[in-house]
């Protein structure tokens, strides 16, 4: 059974977050948490929080055992960009 968790509108570059996500793809939950704890990247706490949310969803909503869970699929896409406006004379 697939359990999903989302983190929308996170203020970090997708390229930086993908470096961390690639480390935990396909790993057991305990191993992924250990990797995230000792990875000194700015995306690590964000991904760790997301992983804990997914585990909570699995345990609480679907009554799954936490020891049998692993990261099957995890990915990072680009979010919306903030519009930047530079007010000045245009003529």
Swiss-Prot record:
Q: Which UniProt keywords apply?
A: Ribonucleoprotein, Ribosomal protein, RNA-binding, rRNA-binding
One Pfam family this sequence matches: Ribosomal_L22
Q: Name one GO molecular function term.
A: rRNA binding
Q: Does the keyword Cytoplasm apply?
A: no
Classification via InterPro entries: Ribosomal_uL22, Ribosomal_uL22_bac/chlpt-type, Ribosomal_uL22_bac/org-type, Ribosomal_uL22_sf
Which GO biological-process labels does this protein carry? translation
Q: PANTHER family in the record, alphabetically?
A: CHLOROPLAST 50S RIBOSOMAL PROTEIN L22-RELATED (PTHR13501), LARGE RIBOSOMAL SUBUNIT PROTEIN UL22M (PTHR13501:SF8)
As for family, the record states: Belongs to the universal ribosomal protein uL22 family.
Protein name as annotated: Large ribosomal subunit protein uL22
Native organism: Loofah witches'-broom phytoplasma
Give the gene symbol. rplV
